[in-house]
């Protein structure tokens, strides 16, 4: 049996789903271990690709203080012993961590049971857990690490199917990540009338916390907008879109890349180690995206960018920047290393 562990946010969970799909193609149904917190249940409770799903009461350690940090560590340690016993009982051959605090019990449980641990780091800057565990991993996968045995990001094949050659801006997507982004929502509200006058269709993923505000805003303006809080069918949304304005979580960066959607990235300013900035900077350095800091966000500059962007060449180059099949390449390494 193979275990996939990790989660908390959509970026981690999208990797888990992509790897699960690749294992399924090899007639393997992994066990999934996540957390009772975050979005893990929303994504995977009852998901048919996994043989079984287990959600443990673990929380992050980094943002805790004092006794809260000790309590969080204690929970992780207890659940690590639970995972160790489960792995031994099930005859687990390998554990694949996709990062996030939800991965801690399973990853430590694997080391305690002397089961090969494989880690995928999604961001340009290693997370603290992944940095701690990297020396003990059988293999460490990262699109930003020159020593990674597989360098392409594990994007689901659905996003490659969402590719089409874009030649002009007909539909603009505001994408704030799985939890939404107030700064991106505010920008959308500011430039929506201008977009409407230009005849540009608007798709807006605003997050649950801002859904009612967004509904009221667009109703007041009487402008047609495809508005939603969150979707599991982002590939279909990307297929409709010509250009995106988005956060720079690694999942979003590489899914937009696979679908060939040119983007303006506005990194979340409080992301650990500023990793969202560096996720997008890798593409910006190749001339494949535009990057604006949130505190320097200017609607007039955004309008100017939208008027000047060379959609056709960037769309084609983005799609060529990432190869499909990375999930299969990763599970091939996992299966070989677990023998």
Give names to the regions the model predicted.
Residues 12-23:
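Short amphipathic alpha-helix
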Residues 92-94, 239-252, 261-262:
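Acidic donor-binding loop of glycosyltransferase active sites
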Residues 312-324:
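A short, well-ordered alpha-helix in the C-terminal region of glycosyltransferases
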Residues 38-49, 166-243, 277-280, 285, ...:
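Donor-nucleotide binding loops and adjacent catalytic segments primarily
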Residues 4-7, 26-74, 210, 293-295:
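Conserved nucleotide-sugar phosphate-binding/catalytic loop shared by glycosyltransferases and other
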Residues 28-29, 50-51, 111-161:
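Active-site-proximal region of nucleotide-activated glycan assembly enzymes
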Residues 113, 239-241, 255-266, 286:
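Conserved donor-binding/catalytic loop of nucleotide-activated donor transferases
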Residues 65-94:
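An amphipathic, basic-hydrophobic alpha-helix
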